[in-house]
Every structure is written in structure tokens, then in C-alpha cells.
Amino acid sequence: MLFRSRLFGACVDVVGIVNMQTFLEKTSDYRRKLREVEYGPLSDPEFLKTISPIHKADKINVPVLIGHGFNDPRVPVEEAMQLAVALKDRKQSPRLFIAPDEGHGFQKLENRIYFNERVVQFLDETIGARKPMAIPNP
């Protein structure tokens, strides 16, 4: 999205990591060790900054819908909040849905239905509804 933004008309972020440093700082010790192997060590904040989308938020020039569970044990909800604030600071109007009774992702049926309805509505409004493809007869 950040590097090919002109290809996209909208963005839906679900439980996304946006700031690698704050993500690692707020992650449990055992999970941090696993993630540092994948993303880089917390002891190298300059590198983490280079791979953190939050520091490139000025390149996001399309509407954004953000979804997150308030009790997410893997990606703290603060990640979603940081993105929403960064976009608002740039005069954008992100849509934010925080499910108060969810963890990582939307597991409860009512939350999945609600969020997916918001996604469809958001995409209809931002990139437009498309006609369904005709399915050829076999």
C-alpha cells in the first residue's frame, strides 16, 4: 500500500502493526523474541523506524478503514490508534472500529458480521460497487 499507493483506491487495515518499536515494546517477552527474529531487534530503533508504516503515513492518500480488537494479545490496540491519529493529523478521516470484546481479529459472529458489513459499505463508497462476474455454465 505504501509503496504502490496509486494502485489502490482504498485501504482496509485489520489488526495491523504500524509502529514496530511500540509493537515490540508492548509485546510479551516470549512473543517479542520471536518477532525480533522476524522484524529486527528492539535495540535498533533506527532500523525499526525504517520498516514502520506509521513513519510513512504521509504517503497514504486513500481512504482508510481500521479494525481492531480492544483486547488483542498479539498486536496491541494502540497500533490501530496510532494510525488513526497519524491520518487525522494529516487531515484525513479514517474510519475506526474497535471491538471492545475481541482479541486478535474478529472471532465473535456479531463482530464479524458488523465489521464485514462496514468493509462492504466502505469499499462501495470509496471505490464503487462492481457488477458481479457472470459465472459461465459448465
Labelled PLM ranges:
Residues M1-P138:
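Active-site-proximal cap/loop segments of hydrolase catalytic domains
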